[in-house]
Amino acid sequence: LYDDIVIKPTWEVLTDTKSDDIVIEIDPGIAFGTGSHETTKLCIGQLKKYLKPGDTVFDVGCGSGILSMIASRLGAGFVHGMDIDELAVRASEENAKLNHMGEDKIKFSCGNLLADNYIGKGTTFELDRSTIKEAQHLDVDRQYDIVVANILADVIVPLSAVIDPYLTENGYFITS
């Protein structure tokens, strides 16, 4: 992917890595995000450029969790990945476990920041093995140093109008 970032599908065997490579093992399932798409590479490049150790990151439309996990391995202090698709959230959680990333550093939730046109609010959901239920209406209770959204332009455009409350004063909004 990059000289020092390797995305390894669970079904492949790595043969050529360096000791300082960041290796992310992933099983995308039906969720978007294997790391090979050009837009994903653009977002990774911007994360490498702007992320500082200890930064907080909000991955909106996290898909398989690939950008969340890379941000964590690049030194983010905490990463929150959110997706509107319950299956994507489950895939992200499984991929984080596969890469030995604990919930103290990386968390995933199901939600929609554009729900009901509430600026700065969204709906999150609690997931269990058999049901999905609305848990709370999410107020902006945390700001992030970086918000990354590798999703369709049709979503990024309206999202850009509501993302400001989630960013710290000098935060970055990375989109592709």
Q: What do the PLM-derived regions correspond to, one by one?
A:
Residues 30, 34-114:
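Conserved SAM/SAH cofactor-binding pocket of Class I
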Residues 14, 33, 154:
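Active-site beta-alpha loop architecture of Rossmann-like, nucleotide-cofactor-dependent enzymes
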Residues 1-17:
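N-terminal auxiliary segments of SAM/dcSAM-dependent transferases
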